[in-house]
Amino acid sequence: MSGLTIFSDQEPQQPLWQSRDAQAIGQQLAQIGVRFERWQADRELGENPDPAVVIAAYQHQIDRLVAEKGYQSWDVISMRPDNAQREVLRSKFLSEHTHGEDEVRFFVEGAGLFCLHLDGKIFQILCEKNDLISVPANTRHWFDMGSAPNFTAIRVFDNPEGWVAHFTGDNIADAYPRLD
C-alpha cells in the first residue's frame, strides 16, 4: 500500500505526519507541487516484462500524459533482485540530486521510495503498483529501490538528456529511513 511520511529536515527520527490513504497523500503532495495519483496497472506482464510489451499495455496512459504536458519520450525501467547491477544502481540514486525536468513515473509493478527535500521537510513517498508520481524539475530528492529491487515503472520525459542527475553534495539522505 502506498504511503507518505513527512519529517522535518532536522529530525529524521520523528515523523510529523504519516498516511497510507491515497487521497490524503495526493492532497499533501499537491501542496508542494507534486502530482500523485492512483492509476490502473491491471495488465499481466509476466515474470520479466519486455519494455515494448509494457509500453504497448499502457500506451493509453502514456498518451494521456503526453496530451496533458507535452512530454516527448518514454521508456521502461525494470529491476529485479537478481540484477547484477542492483547495488551500483541503488547507491547512485540514494544521494540527494535534482533533474532539469520533471521526474514522472508510473509504477506498473513493485515499489520504490521517493524522498523529496522541500521547504525544510523530507517527504518520503512509498510508490507501489498503480501509483503515478511527478516530481517537479529541480526538486532535491533521492530514490531508494531497496536491497532486493522488484519493480517496473514507465518513465516519461520532456527530453531524455534533461533527466541527467545533478548531485547536490548534501549527505542528508543518509540520516533518513530507507526502503528496507
Curated annotation (Swiss-Prot):
Site residues, Important to generate the dianion: R105
Binding site for Fe(2+): H97, H99, E103, H141
Keyword line: Amino-acid biosynthesis, Dioxygenase, Iron, Metal-binding, Methionine biosynthesis, Nickel, Oxidoreductase
SUPFAM superfamilies, sorted: RmlC-like cupins
Entry-linked Pfam families: ARD (PF03079)
Keyword Metal-binding part of the UniProt annotation: yes
Site (May play a role in transmitting local conformational changes): D102
Superkingdom of origin: Bacteria
InterPro entries, A to Z: ARD, ARD_bac, RmlC-like_jellyroll, RmlC_Cupin_sf
Listed name of the protein: Acireductone dioxygenase
GO biological process: L-methionine salvage from methylthioadenosine; L-methionine salvage from S-adenosylmethionine
Cofactor(s) essential for the protein: Fe(2+); Ni(2+)
Family membership noted in the UniProt record: Belongs to the acireductone dioxygenase (ARD) family.
Site, as annotated: May play a role in metal incorporation in vivo: E96
Keyword Iron attached: yes
Catalytic activity entry: 1,2-dihydroxy-5-(methylsulfanyl)pent-1-en-3-one + O2 = 3-(methylsulfanyl)propanoate + CO + formate + 2 H(+); 1,2-dihydroxy-5-(methylsulfanyl)pent-1-en-3-one + O2 = 4-methylsulfanyl-2-oxobutanoate + formate + 2 H(+)
Pathways per UniProt: Amino-acid biosynthesis; L-methionine biosynthesis via salvage pathway; L-methionine from S-methyl-5-thio-alpha-D-ribose 1-phosphate: step 5/6
